[in-house]
From Swiss-Prot:
Gene expressing this chain: fae-hps
Function: Catalyzes the condensation of formaldehyde with tetrahydromethanopterin (H(4)MPT) to 5,10-methylenetetrahydromethanopterin. Catalyzes the reversible formation of ribulose-5-phosphate and formaldehyde from 3-hexulose-6-phosphate.
Family: In the N-terminal section; belongs to the formaldehyde-activating enzyme family. In the C-terminal section; belongs to the HPS/KGPDC family. HPS subfamily.
Catalytic machinery residues: 17
Name recorded for this polypeptide: Bifunctional enzyme Fae/Hps
Length: 393
């Protein structure tokens, strides 16, 4: 047996995070159990979980501090409410039948417990660690999460301790606001006016990046820390280097020009994958977008069918979106840019567009928030988890 469980419960400095492994005494878990009790280190001394002095919990459980214990107060918290909570949770799990028909004398548990240096409230420390241990045991035996749950949940919420969300584009359609602004004061004003919405993407436009460099991504993050930010660099050369620069600036996506050599595009896409950001090909002035996508050895995450600002008076030419997606193997988002206005949103969505790129219709509006909300309303998408009550994850 080798089962793994994890749970985080609580809030503030007293929150509890318990990682545990359940396994046979005569296997690798048993060996790790013995090593934990025999190979001690200052500030991380493991301790057997006892319900009270002289009453060992079963299955035998060793509590391992994750954080270095630096003073008497922390030691008292670990040997007091944390240890008692873990021991009681294990004992209650036995009583409630979580271990099934397993002989509790044949297995043992490694429980790694987090204790924040600023924690003070013994009552909360106990209750949070009890709940986290109990939930971690339950999850271990349920082998939680299953693949379906993992895929469904991985992009939905922010990590409770990290404090910010890293957005991913899994629930189209989206509105992408193109910031082709070259004044930082105006930029901050527009950003502050944009509504908070899971379906709103922010684009650092090419003029903005040329004026202020990629450091402008940090300016955007200062106002919109949870935003999905696209760096529209229109890469034409040194694809891997410029894609890495975009990733290092904390952009979520980087744009390359479809007019670049295929090798440059492929290097940029590969580098974007390595750094965990999205790759976007801008098809401005590309005669055969379908042919280009089909010819690439590695496919982008997004294709942008983009008409230049100087050509917006011409008729819509978004191409055959279905053929583009087919050429990419089906797993591709398509953005439409140039001349997008509220009355044509539905038309663009009907063609298969996943992202609508809008610039001056929002950024030059007298009421930026209202203009953005008009477009978002046309998407007819609820906020992700708007009606969900978050509990364990």
């Amino acid at each position: 047996m080798y089962l793994i469980g994890e749970a985080l419960i609580g809030e503030g400095s007293e929150l509890a995070h318990v990682d545990l492994i359940v396994g046979d005494k005569n296997g690798p878990v048993g060996m790790a159990f013995a090593n934990a009790l025999s190979q001690l280190s200052a500030g991380h001394t493991p301790l057997l979980a006892v319900v009270r002095p002289n009453l060992l919990t079963k299955p035998a459980t060793v509590v391992i501090p994750k954080v270095t214990l630096k003073n008497e107060g922390q030691v008292n918290q670990m040997f007091g409410p944390v240890q008692a909570a873990v021991a009681k949770a294990v004992a209650d799990a036995v009583e409630e039948g979580l271990f099934g028909d397993i002989n509790i004398n044949d297995i043992c548990i490694l429980a790694s417990a987090f204790l924040h240096p600023s924690a003070k409230d013994y009552n909360r420390i106990y209750r949070y660690n009890y709940g986290a241990t109990k939930l971690a045991i339950s999850r271990a035996f349920e082998e939680f999460p299953d693949e379906k749950t993992l895929i469904h949940e991985k992009d939905r919420a922010a990590h409770a301790v990290m404090g910010f969300k890293v957005p991913r584009l899994w629930d189209p359609p989206y509105l992408q606001v193109a910031l082709d602004i070259v004044d930082l004061g105006k930029l901050r004003s527009v950003l502050s006016s944009l509504p908070e919405n899971d379906h709103l993407i922010i684009e650092a436009g090419t003029p903005l990046i040329k004026k202020f460099g990629l450091n402008v991504i940090s300016e955007i993050r200062a106002v919109k820390p949870n935003a999905f930010i696209v760096a529209d660099m229109k890469i034409l050369d040194t694809g891997n280097l410029e894609a890495r620069m975009a990733a290092d600036s904390s952009a979520d996506a980087v744009v390359m020009s479809g007019l670049a050599p295929a090798s440059t595009i492929e290097k940029a896409i590969t580098e974007a994958r390595k750094t965990g950001i999205y790759s976007v090909i801008d098809m401005l002035n590309v005669e055969d977008p379908v042919g280009l996508i089909a010819s690439l050895k590695v496919k982008p995450d997004i294709v942008e069918l983009h008409r230049a600002i100087d050509a917006e008076h011409t008729s819509h030419a978004w191409g055959n979106i279905g053929d583009i997606k087919k050429a990419a193997g089906g797993k591709l988002l398509v953005a439409t840019a140039g001349g997008i206005r509220v009355p044509v949103v539905k038309e663009a969505l009907k063609t298969g567009a996943d992202i609508l790129v809008v610039g001056r219709a929002i950024t030059a509006s007298k009421d930026v928030r209202h203009a953005a909300e008009e477009f978002l309303e046309q998407l007819n998408k609820e906020e992700i988890d708007q009606f969900r009550i978050m509990t364990d994850f």
